Amino acid sequence: MSLPLHPSLNNGITKGSANFSGGKLRCKCSSSPVEVTLAGNVAHNHACGCSKCWKPEGAIFSVIGVIPKEQVSVTANADKLYIVDESAAIQRHACSGCGVHLYGRIEKEHPFKGLDFVHTELSSEKGWQEPQFAAFVSSIIEQGFDPSKMDAVRAQFKSIGLETYDALNPPLMDAIASWTAQKAKI
Protein backbone atom coordinates (compact mmCIF):
# COMPACT_ATOMS: atom_id res chain seq x y z
CA MET A 1 0.00 0.00 0.00
CA SER A 2 1.42 3.34 -1.05
CA LEU A 3 1.57 6.11 1.56
CA PRO A 4 0.80 9.75 0.62
CA LEU A 5 4.36 11.00 1.10
CA HIS A 6 3.87 14.13 -1.04
CA PRO A 7 2.03 14.77 -4.33
CA SER A 8 5.32 15.34 -6.18
CA LEU A 9 6.72 12.02 -4.90
CA ASN A 10 3.75 9.66 -4.96
CA ASN A 11 4.30 8.66 -8.60
CA GLY A 12 8.09 8.73 -8.55
CA ILE A 13 10.50 11.60 -9.06
CA THR A 14 10.57 13.92 -12.05
CA LYS A 15 14.15 14.85 -12.89
CA GLY A 16 14.93 18.57 -12.96
CA SER A 17 17.01 20.47 -15.50
CA ALA A 18 20.61 21.51 -14.82
CA ASN A 19 19.99 24.66 -16.90
CA PHE A 20 16.74 25.70 -15.20
CA SER A 21 16.76 29.44 -14.50
CA GLY A 22 13.95 29.85 -11.97
CA GLY A 23 10.32 30.84 -11.96
CA LYS A 24 7.41 32.05 -9.87
CA LEU A 25 5.82 30.54 -6.77
CA ARG A 26 2.17 31.32 -6.04
CA CYS A 27 0.08 30.65 -2.97
CA LYS A 28 -3.24 28.77 -3.25
CA CYS A 29 -5.53 31.83 -3.15
CA SER A 30 -7.88 31.91 -6.15
CA SER A 31 -7.77 35.71 -6.28
CA SER A 32 -4.84 38.01 -5.54
CA PRO A 33 -2.32 35.23 -4.85
CA VAL A 34 1.00 36.05 -3.26
CA GLU A 35 3.71 35.67 -5.90
CA VAL A 36 7.39 35.09 -5.20
CA THR A 37 9.93 35.15 -8.04
CA LEU A 38 13.01 32.93 -7.79
CA ALA A 39 15.87 34.02 -10.07
CA GLY A 40 17.52 30.61 -10.17
CA ASN A 41 17.11 26.95 -9.35
CA VAL A 42 17.06 25.54 -5.83
CA ALA A 43 19.70 23.35 -4.18
CA HIS A 44 19.44 20.58 -1.60
CA ASN A 45 15.78 19.97 -2.51
CA HIS A 46 14.42 17.33 -0.14
CA ALA A 47 11.40 15.78 1.51
CA CYS A 48 11.09 17.04 5.10
CA GLY A 49 9.16 15.43 7.93
CA CYS A 50 9.60 18.22 10.49
CA SER A 51 6.54 19.75 12.12
CA LYS A 52 7.34 23.31 11.01
CA CYS A 53 7.40 23.02 7.20
CA TRP A 54 4.18 23.55 5.26
CA LYS A 55 2.74 20.39 3.76
CA PRO A 56 0.02 20.10 1.11
CA GLU A 57 -3.30 18.69 2.31
CA GLY A 58 -2.99 14.97 3.02
CA ALA A 59 0.80 14.84 2.57
CA ILE A 60 3.01 13.30 5.25
CA PHE A 61 6.08 15.29 4.13
CA SER A 62 6.86 18.67 2.66
CA VAL A 63 9.31 19.12 -0.21
CA ILE A 64 11.63 22.06 0.25
CA GLY A 65 14.82 23.44 -1.29
CA VAL A 66 17.10 26.40 -0.67
CA ILE A 67 18.12 29.34 -2.82
CA PRO A 68 20.29 32.42 -2.08
CA LYS A 69 18.04 35.08 -0.54
CA GLU A 70 19.26 37.61 -3.14
CA GLN A 71 17.46 35.48 -5.75
CA VAL A 72 14.10 35.68 -3.93
CA SER A 73 11.69 38.59 -4.37
CA VAL A 74 8.03 39.02 -3.53
CA THR A 75 6.47 40.26 -6.77
CA ALA A 76 2.74 40.37 -5.93
CA ASN A 77 0.55 40.82 -2.85
CA ALA A 78 3.34 41.09 -0.27
CA ASP A 79 0.83 42.69 2.11
CA LYS A 80 -0.77 39.25 2.61
CA LEU A 81 2.42 37.73 4.06
CA TYR A 82 3.01 37.21 7.77
CA ILE A 83 5.69 35.35 9.76
CA VAL A 84 4.30 32.11 11.20
CA ASP A 85 6.59 31.93 14.26
CA GLU A 86 8.85 34.90 14.92
CA SER A 87 10.86 32.91 17.50
CA ALA A 88 11.82 30.17 15.01
CA ALA A 89 15.26 30.14 13.37
CA ILE A 90 13.59 29.96 9.95
CA GLN A 91 11.14 32.87 9.60
CA ARG A 92 8.44 31.20 7.50
CA HIS A 93 6.50 33.78 5.48
CA ALA A 94 2.97 32.50 4.87
CA CYS A 95 -0.10 33.84 3.10
CA SER A 96 -2.73 35.14 5.52
CA GLY A 97 -5.44 34.02 3.09
CA CYS A 98 -4.62 30.36 2.43
CA GLY A 99 -1.86 29.58 4.95
CA VAL A 100 0.69 28.41 2.37
CA HIS A 101 4.34 29.10 3.26
CA LEU A 102 5.99 30.99 0.39
CA TYR A 103 9.53 31.25 1.74
CA GLY A 104 11.50 30.87 4.94
CA ARG A 105 14.35 33.24 5.75
CA ILE A 106 16.98 33.02 8.49
CA GLU A 107 17.71 36.44 9.99
CA LYS A 108 19.88 35.44 12.96
CA GLU A 109 23.36 33.92 13.04
CA HIS A 110 23.00 30.41 11.61
CA PRO A 111 24.96 28.13 9.25
CA PHE A 112 22.29 28.56 6.56
CA LYS A 113 21.84 32.33 6.91
CA GLY A 114 21.65 33.80 3.42
CA LEU A 115 19.63 30.89 2.05
CA ASP A 116 15.84 30.98 1.76
CA PHE A 117 13.74 27.83 2.03
CA VAL A 118 11.08 27.46 -0.69
CA HIS A 119 8.47 24.99 -1.94
CA THR A 120 8.94 24.63 -5.72
CA GLU A 121 5.64 22.73 -6.01
CA LEU A 122 4.02 26.18 -5.81
CA SER A 123 5.41 26.90 -9.27
CA SER A 124 3.83 25.94 -12.59
CA GLU A 125 7.26 25.97 -14.29
CA LYS A 126 9.01 22.64 -14.87
CA GLY A 127 12.72 22.00 -14.37
CA TRP A 128 13.27 22.59 -10.65
CA GLN A 129 15.87 20.37 -8.99
CA GLU A 130 14.26 17.09 -8.00
CA PRO A 131 14.31 15.97 -4.35
CA GLN A 132 17.72 14.59 -3.35
CA PHE A 133 16.95 12.91 0.01
CA ALA A 134 14.39 12.70 2.83
CA ALA A 135 15.17 14.50 6.12
CA PHE A 136 13.73 14.42 9.64
CA VAL A 137 11.87 11.23 8.75
CA SER A 138 11.24 10.08 12.33
CA SER A 139 9.74 13.49 13.15
CA ILE A 140 6.45 12.42 11.55
CA ILE A 141 5.87 10.18 14.60
CA GLU A 142 5.78 13.31 16.80
CA GLN A 143 2.93 14.54 14.59
CA GLY A 144 0.81 11.43 15.13
CA PHE A 145 2.13 9.06 12.46
CA ASP A 146 1.96 5.38 13.47
CA PRO A 147 5.51 4.25 14.41
CA SER A 148 4.76 0.73 13.20
CA LYS A 149 4.56 2.09 9.62
CA MET A 150 8.02 3.72 9.61
CA ASP A 151 9.64 0.80 7.77
CA ALA A 152 7.05 1.26 5.02
CA VAL A 153 7.82 5.00 4.83
CA ARG A 154 11.55 4.36 4.48
CA ALA A 155 10.96 1.57 1.95
CA GLN A 156 8.76 3.84 -0.17
CA PHE A 157 11.43 6.55 -0.20
CA LYS A 158 14.07 3.95 -1.10
CA SER A 159 11.86 2.67 -3.95
CA ILE A 160 11.99 6.12 -5.58
CA GLY A 161 15.72 6.49 -5.00
CA LEU A 162 15.81 8.71 -1.91
CA GLU A 163 17.93 8.01 1.16
CA THR A 164 16.26 8.72 4.50
CA TYR A 165 17.81 10.55 7.44
CA ASP A 166 16.59 11.59 10.87
CA ALA A 167 18.43 14.89 10.48
CA LEU A 168 19.69 16.43 7.24
CA ASN A 169 21.90 14.51 4.80
CA PRO A 170 25.63 14.08 5.66
CA PRO A 171 26.96 16.97 3.51
CA LEU A 172 24.55 19.44 5.14
CA MET A 173 25.23 18.09 8.63
CA ASP A 174 28.98 18.44 7.89
CA ALA A 175 28.38 22.05 6.83
CA ILE A 176 26.55 22.77 10.10
CA ALA A 177 29.29 21.12 12.17
CA SER A 178 32.04 22.98 10.25
CA TRP A 179 30.27 26.31 10.79
CA THR A 180 29.88 25.55 14.51
CA ALA A 181 33.54 24.54 14.86
CA GLN A 182 34.66 27.68 13.04
CA LYS A 183 32.54 29.86 15.35
CA ALA A 184 34.08 28.09 18.35
CA LYS A 185 37.55 28.58 16.79
CA ILE A 186 38.23 24.84 16.92
UniProtKB/Swiss-Prot annotation:
Residues 20-166 form the CENP-V/GFA domain. Its cofactor is Zn(2+). It catalyses: S-(hydroxymethyl)glutathione = glutathione + formaldehyde. Keywords: Lyase, Metal-binding, Zinc. Disulfide bonds: none annotated. GO terms for biological process: formaldehyde catabolic process. Its EC number is 4.4.1.22. Zn(2+) 1 binds at C27, C29, C95, C98. Binds 2 Zn(2+) ions per subunit. InterPro entries: CENP-V/GFA, Formald_GSH, Mss4-like_sf. Pfam families: GFA. Catalyzes the condensation of formaldehyde and glutathione to S-hydroxymethylglutathione. NCBIfam families: formald_GSH, PRK05417.1. Belongs to the Gfa family. This is Putative glutathione-dependent formaldehyde-activating enzyme. It comes from Fusarium vanettenii (strain ATCC MYA-4622 / CBS 123669 / FGSC 9596 / NRRL 45880 / 77-13-4).
